[in-house]
Amino acid sequence: MGRHTPVGDFRAYIQGCFSGYGRKGFKLKKAWIQMADFTAGLAPTTFSDPAALPETLDGAGADGRLDKNNILVRYLHTWRNHWTVAGSVELPSSQVDDSDPHTSLLRDYVPDFAFLGQYQWDRGHSHVRLAGVIRDMGYRDLTTDRNHHVLGWGAQLSSVARAGRIVTLYGTVCVGEGISAYLGDLSSGNYDLLADASDPGCLYAPLTLSGSMGAKVQILPRLASTLCLATLRHLPKANPAADTYKYGQYLSINAVYDFSPRLQLGVEYLAGKRKNCNGAEANVNRAEALLSFSF
């Protein structure tokens, strides 16, 4: 953070990790700089609302979690301490089905456009947000040798609100077509555009629904517990590939104790379910613990 510099006040942030699906070594997660109302770099998409997601120790988070980082340029302005609007141009990264022999992928070149409007109260600890995204995704029909572009769109209503001094409530509802790359479980596959089994050479953007709700209770000054419930629904047309994702369900409950501002210990139980379009399904139950030291 810099204050009273020749270019004004600014903030810079960088974050990385050594975990992730199928990855080894260091992974850069965020790297951005903010000056006045402008942000540039690798940052959370304007379409998301990380503050409205219940806290989990599970690194992957809920199955329908909308928590994607994009390279972007964003303008965000707040006035009267209650109203916020923002818009951003974000580097596209569509994830399109590449298994169809009748189509081929096109390079992304039209940016994603994201925007939000928000009302906040309780000194910024509570808010309601409506956000949206518009995407362009292209492919080539090999049966006619023609390029096609499909419009993707998404909308999310989210909120976080303090209910008294010890309880915080969270909630999100998201709907869209061609936004699978933004959503939890679906982001690990190529679900933004799928092959239409009834029309060779045609790809379409399937409808997706997701939602989450949760509550955090500050049991003691140093002990907090958080509950998270979530679901993700993927609604492709008739006759999708057998292993195509259909829906997922998620539950987690945790407790975190702060020994000091730098040292935390947490324990968590989580349960999840996934079902594919062919009826195959799997369930998981897991207990985990986390020891965190900050410096």
Task: Describe each PLM feature range.
Residues 1-95, 109-110, 114, 118-125, ...:
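Outer membrane beta-barrel
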Residues 11-15, 30, 86-88, 129-133, ...:
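Outer-envelope exported proteins of Gram-negative bacteria
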Residues 15-19, 43-45, 90-92, 120, ...:
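Outer-membrane beta-barrel pore domains and translocons
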Residues 23-29, 51-58, 92, 96-105, ...:
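Outer-membrane beta-barrel translocator domains and adjoining extracellular loop/strand segments
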Residues 25-29, 34, 67-71, 109-113, ...:
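Residues that define the transmembrane beta-barrel architecture of outer-membrane proteins
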Residues 115, 120-240, 244-245:
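Detector for outer-membrane/organellar transmembrane beta-barrel domains
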Residues 251-268:
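C-terminal closing repeat unit and adjoining cap/tail of repeat-based domains
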Residues 257-259, 283-295:
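Outer-membrane beta-barrel "beta-signal"
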